Design a protein with these regions (language model features):
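Asp-based, Mg2+/Mn2+-dependent phosphohydrolase catalytic module
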Residues: 1-7, 113, 124, 128-240
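Catalytic-core regions built around general acid/base machinery
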Residues: 107-118
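N-terminal helical cap/lid subdomain that shapes the substrate entry/recognition surface
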Residues: 2-11, 15-106
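Short, conserved clusters of charged catalytic residues that mark active-site
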Residues: 106-107, 162
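A short alpha-helix capping/helix-coil boundary motif
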Residues: 50-54, 88-92, 110-112, 143-146, ...
Length: 240
């Protein structure tokens, strides 16, 4: 797999540990807004359900950034029966604190340093620009990447092929020289696959690296190369 020149990484939960950082940022908001920490686990569970559903709508252009930001905490507060807190203010505090978190996915720094010496590394991420760039800067990741492509700026969130095509064109990268690495099968892998780019699926939570029947069906319909890894350090023998 050493014929590649450009490696495109997803950010959240591929190299920047979104799950833990999101949790830490939201927990930090609780005392500021007078929320009991005993409510946190249930609040976080409900919030994630609403947030995931709203982000799916956003990816399909079914909701605006402003409505997503406003609704995810208002819906959570309402379901929890909590009054007297403005969901927009809570959202702003959360967005201010989250990009300051610095937890990385295990092995991220270990693989990025040697990969950056051999390849041009780039980011393709869904998210809000004011947050994603700060994540990269505060975590020390920014130094490894030549280009960063944020869906909000391009107005085409993954898995839309437009964001992948835009990245290739901007980087002057050919499809056969490019590889997408990400944790989401639907967003990163199928998105890159449909854009004609090879992919590596980072799936640390799966019991093994085998593909499901539905995934194999997708692979058979496409001519790109797909691999699955369970540790970021598995990239080293594949790419170095």
């Amino acid at each position: 797999m050493t014929h590649y020149r450009h490696l495109f990484f997803d950010l959240d939960n591929t190299i920047w540990d979104f799950n833990r950082n999101s949790r830490d940022a939201l927990m930090g908001c609780f005392p500021v807004f007078g929320l009991e920490l005993s409510l946190f686990e249930e609040f976080f569970r409900i919030y994630n359900l609403h947030n995931d559903a709203l982000w799916e709508l956003y990816r399909r252009n079914g909701i605006s950034k402003e409505d997503l930001s406003k609704a995810r905490f208002n819906l959570t507060l309402e379901e929890m029966g909590i009054s007297g807190i403005d969901g927009r203010e809570l959202n702003q505090a959360y967005l201010s604190g989250m990009p300051l978190q610095t937890r990385l996915c295990e092995g991220a720094m270990e693989v990025l340093a040697p990969l950056a010496r051999k390849y041009q590394l780039h980011i393709i991420t869904n998210g809000f620009s004011e947050v994603q760039y700060k994540k990269l800067g505060h975590s020390g990741l920014a130094t490894f990447f030549s280009k960063v492509f944020v869906s909000e700026e391009i107005k085409a969130p993954k898995p839309a092929p437009e964001i992948f095509r835009h990245a290739l064109k901007t980087c002057n990268a050919r499809k056969r020289e490019s590889l997408m690495i990400g944790d989401s099968w639907e967003v990163d892998i199928l998105g890159a696959m449909n854009a004609g780019i090879d992919q590596i699926h980072y799936a640390p939570d799966l019991p093994d690296a085998s593909f499901t029947p539905a995934e194999r069906e997708s692979l058979h319909k496409n001519r790109t190369l797909t691999r699955r890894i369970q540790k970021l350090t598995d990239l080293i023998p594949l790419l170095l």
